[in-house]
Amino acid sequence: MAGGLAAQEAGLADVIFVGRADHVDAPGATVHDPATSDLTDGFAQVFHELRKHKGMDEAKARAAVQTPLVYAAMLVREGHATGTVGGAVATTSDVVRTAIQVIGKAPDAAMVSSFFAMYPPRSPASDANGLSRAMVYSDCGLVIAPSSTELAAIAAQSAGEQGDRGSFGLAGHPSGPQRRWRIAV
């Protein structure tokens, strides 16, 4: 919660915390409790429509949207939020699976990959406002053994998300030398 509050205080985001209000210690913050939210019934109907082809009935859909991951993803899908942060208490696979089931992937995306961004403390590379440039670590665990084509697509997508081509390097991989040729891709 501290990160969300800091982002809000810095004017970087309008944060919505998802969870039980009595468990969220964030005075003045917006809190959505999926168990009591006015949005839950509508979210349950939408989620049921999305997943009924997989055998999900209305009761299971309602139970699912009362979980923080699904509720947060529904906030994004339905336009109440522009993004969601999850993973501190959920596995990467749970976060990604939920996002795919609720939000889906971009129509032009051939695959789903992941990244995380690190913002180092103030450094010579910081801008005039003291903000450091993000270091983006792409697909650190979702596409385990990418082909050269997949690796190139992941790198291009990550650079595009940052608004420029950026510079990048490829770190070591357990499969070693047979992957080194991919750097030229």
Regions found by a protein language model. Name each.
Residues 1-17, 21-185:
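Anion-binding alpha/beta catalytic cores of soluble intermediary-metabolism enzymes, centered on
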